[in-house]
């Protein structure tokens, strides 16, 4: 079965405190949904090289055992509560993708 992934790119972070509040709620929701954070750059000391229209501000990659599990985690009550913590006008490019078998 192909794995599922959350891919998030944050073009700019205007309110770091609210993003931290979101993270405190989102982390447990992701874990409860079976997700594993593979990358949280650059905040965990990793490196990012952005090419073309790429933005190096913040990139998050979360792995799930299946695409369906990734969708269910996003739709979960716990994660929806985390989304409410994001600042007004917050911008991110978020998608759920299915990996190759």
Label every model-predicted segment.
Residues 36-39, 82-83, 92-95:
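A short linear hydrophobic-aromatic micro-motif
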Residues 70-91:
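C-terminal structural segments of small proteins and small subunits
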Residues 87-101:
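C-terminal end-helix/capping segment
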């Amino acid at each position: 079965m192909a794995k599922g992934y959350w891919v998030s790119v944050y073009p700019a972070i205007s309110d770091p405190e609210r993003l931290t509040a979101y993270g405190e709620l989102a982390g447990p929701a992701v874990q409860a949904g079976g997700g594993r954070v593979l990358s949280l750059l650059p905040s965990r000391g990793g490196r990012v090289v952005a090419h073309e229209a790429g933005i190096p501000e913040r990139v998050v990659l979360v792995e799930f055992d299946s695409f369906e599990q990734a969708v269910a985690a996003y739709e979960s009550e716990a994660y929806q509560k985390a989304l409410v913590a994001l600042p007004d006008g917050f911008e991110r490019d978020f998608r759920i993708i299915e990996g190759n078998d």
